[in-house]
């Protein structure tokens, strides 16, 4: 029995002719059906495995297609970013150049303004000195007019022809300004000569 069960557990293809002849028809039929059933189960299992592998392959192919689409989109975005970077870099260089030009212009303008301001300050100082000189000159002329007026009045009072007519022109010659206006020139020697000229 031990040898018979061992023979049954072995595949038919691995049995020798003597072992096959030793088996009965029922044993051979059962053995054959068992092997066919095992082979069918193996084929079914293999088919399932193939379907599973195909399904996984389809999933991988779909994932690869999606990755290709994503890669293409990323390449396009990368190219757009490159173009944008080039544009921004050109714009940056233009702005940098413009800023440098404005800086040079600012330095030049500041230099010119300093020079002009220095000239204006010098002219202002000269004008102030001239104004001070004119004020002093007007004060001197005013004092001179007062002296000449007093002299004219005294000469008019001492003349025998009457002093009323001569006193009025002498009073007109007085400068009532503050010494800084142009009317202070009324007391110039030429005009005083005309005013007080009856005795000349």
Curated annotation (Swiss-Prot):
Coiled-coil positions: 57-84
Check the UniProt entry and state the signal peptide residues, or none: none
Q: Where is this region: Disordered?
A: 178-200
- InterPro entries assigned to the protein according to its UniProt record, in alphabetical order: CCDC85
Q: Does the keyword Transmembrane helix apply?
A: no
Choose any GO biological process term that the UniProt entry carries and state it: neural tube closure
Q: What are its GO cellular component terms?
A: adherens junction; centrosome; cytoplasm; nucleus
Q: What happens when the gene is disrupted?
A: Morpholino knockdown of the protein results in neural tube closure defects and a disorganization of the neuroepithelium. This developmental phenotype is associated with an alteration of cell-cell junctions.
The protein depicted here goes by the name Coiled-coil domain-containing protein 85B
Upper taxonomic classification of the species? Eukaryota, Metazoa, Chordata, Craniata, Vertebrata
């Amino acid at each position: 029995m031990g040898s018979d069960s061992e023979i049954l557990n072995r595949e038919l293809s691995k049995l020798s002719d003597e072992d096959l002849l030793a088996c009965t028809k029922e044993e051979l039929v059962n053995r054959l059906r068992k092997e066919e059933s095992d082979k069918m189960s193996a084929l079914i299992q293999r088919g399932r495995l193939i379907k599973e592998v195909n399904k996984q392959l389809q999933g991988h192919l779909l994932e690869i297609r999606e990755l290709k689409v994503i890669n293409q989109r990323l390449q396009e975005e990368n190219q757009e970013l490159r173009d944008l970077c080039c544009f921004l870099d050109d714009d940056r260089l233009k702005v940098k150049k413009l800023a440098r030009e404005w800086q040079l212009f600012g330095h030049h303008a500041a230099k010119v303004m300093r020079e002009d301001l220095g000239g204006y300050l010098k002219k202002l100082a000269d004008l102030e000195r001239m104004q001070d000189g004119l004020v002093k000159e007007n004060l001197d002329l005013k004092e001179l007019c007062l002296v000449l007026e007093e002299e004219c009045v005294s000469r008019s009072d001492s003349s025998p022809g009457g002093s009323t007519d001569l006193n009025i022109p002498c009073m007109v010659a007085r400068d009532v300004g503050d010494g800084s206006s142009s009317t202070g020139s009324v007391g110039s020697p030429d005009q005083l000569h005309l005013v007080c000229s009856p005795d000349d």
